[in-house]
């Protein structure tokens, strides 16, 4: 597969690669990801037991979610297109004495292999790739029958724009400026339609709410900004 055929945005890839050395700093530029990670794990564990399950973490970055999944008994493979992030993930997992299979790999290459997974996570990635529907389709091709896929992304509406771009990037400086592109945000109806076209069935959609006074995230019935979705392949 040539670089022009890959489902990656080179500017997005470079932007997150530049954050690699700060990835595991809970007070650094990736602080929101550190705050949201326990909420992602909580949601996944509400839907399925992790112990002994083979998990593919797509767009694993520096390994925040991959490590959390491994510590809860999952057998984890983490893939990302950023070599610098995969290096950070490998080094940190080694320090923690965790056995995680990290690969700097395009997910489409994995679809040609025989291995299929019980669980696939694709968190905060869809809004950063040129073709999110293609990403969902490839995830669907890698799940076992009856397995569960988890996506998290950002709704596309005025409130989401105010919260995630104006608020998070410019007012509270929770994220580096330019982290998000509003045009790439995804409505739940769009995510569901793309997933169903790939043979998936929606099980649940749950919102993620930020409490500024507590400086923490939690699950919510409000999906107007950040949200998580769980699908299955039957």
UniProtKB/Swiss-Prot annotation:
GO biological process terms on file: methylation
Catalysed reactions, as listed in the record: a 3-demethylubiquinol + S-adenosyl-L-methionine = a ubiquinol + S-adenosyl-L-homocysteine + H(+); a 3-(all-trans-polyprenyl)benzene-1,2-diol + S-adenosyl-L-methionine = a 2-methoxy-6-(all-trans-polyprenyl)phenol + S-adenosyl-L-homocysteine + H(+)
Keyword tags: Methyltransferase, S-adenosyl-L-methionine, Transferase, Ubiquinone biosynthesis
Pfam families: Methyltransf_23
EC number: 2.1.1.222, 2.1.1.64
Residues involved in S-adenosyl-L-methionine binding: 40, 59, 80, 123
UniProt superkingdom: Bacteria
Leading EC class: transferase
Pathway connected to this protein: Cofactor biosynthesis; ubiquinone biosynthesis
GO MF term set: 2-polyprenyl-6-hydroxyphenol methylase activity; 3-demethylubiquinol 3-O-methyltransferase activity; polyprenyldihydroxybenzoate methyltransferase activity
InterPro entries, per the entry: SAM-dependent_MTases_sf, UbiG_MeTrfase
Similarity comment: family membership: Belongs to the methyltransferase superfamily. UbiG/COQ3 family.
Function as written in the Swiss-Prot or TrEMBL entry: O-methyltransferase that catalyzes the 2 O-methylation steps in the ubiquinone biosynthetic pathway.
Protein name in UniProt: Ubiquinone biosynthesis O-methyltransferase
Organism: Coxiella burnetii (strain CbuK_Q154) (Coxiella burnetii (strain Q154))
Gene name as annotated: ubiG
């Amino acid at each position: 597969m040539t670089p022009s055929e890959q489902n990656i945005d080179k500017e997005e890839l470079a932007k997150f690669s530049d954050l690699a050395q700060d990835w595991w700093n809970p007070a650094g530029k990736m602080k929101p990801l550190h705050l949201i990670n326990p909420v992602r794990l909580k949601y996944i564990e509400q839907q399925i037991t992790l112990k002994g399950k083979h998990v593919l973490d797509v767009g694993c970055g520096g390994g925040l979610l991959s490590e959390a999944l491994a510590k809860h008994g999952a057998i984890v493979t983490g893939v990302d297109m950023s070599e610098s992030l995969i290096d950070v993930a490998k080094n940190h997992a080694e320090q923690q004495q965790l056995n995680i299979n990290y690969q700097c790999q395009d997910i489409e290459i994995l679809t040609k292999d025989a291995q299929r997974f019980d669980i696939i996570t694709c968190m905060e990635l869809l809004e950063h790739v040129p073709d999110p529907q293609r990403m969902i389709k490839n995830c669907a091709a890698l799940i076992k029958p009856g397995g569960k896929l988890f996506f998290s992304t950002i709704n596309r509406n005025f409130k989401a724009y105010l919260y995630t771009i104006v608020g998070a990037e410019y007012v509270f400086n929770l994220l580096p400026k330019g982290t998000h592109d509003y045009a790439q945000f995804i409505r739940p109806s769009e995510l569901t339609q793309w997933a169903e076209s790939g043979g998936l069935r929606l099980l649940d959609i749950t919102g993620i709410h930020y409490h500024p006074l507590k400086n923490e995230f939690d699950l919510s019935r409000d999906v107007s900004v950040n949200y998580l979705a769980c699908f299955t392949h039957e």
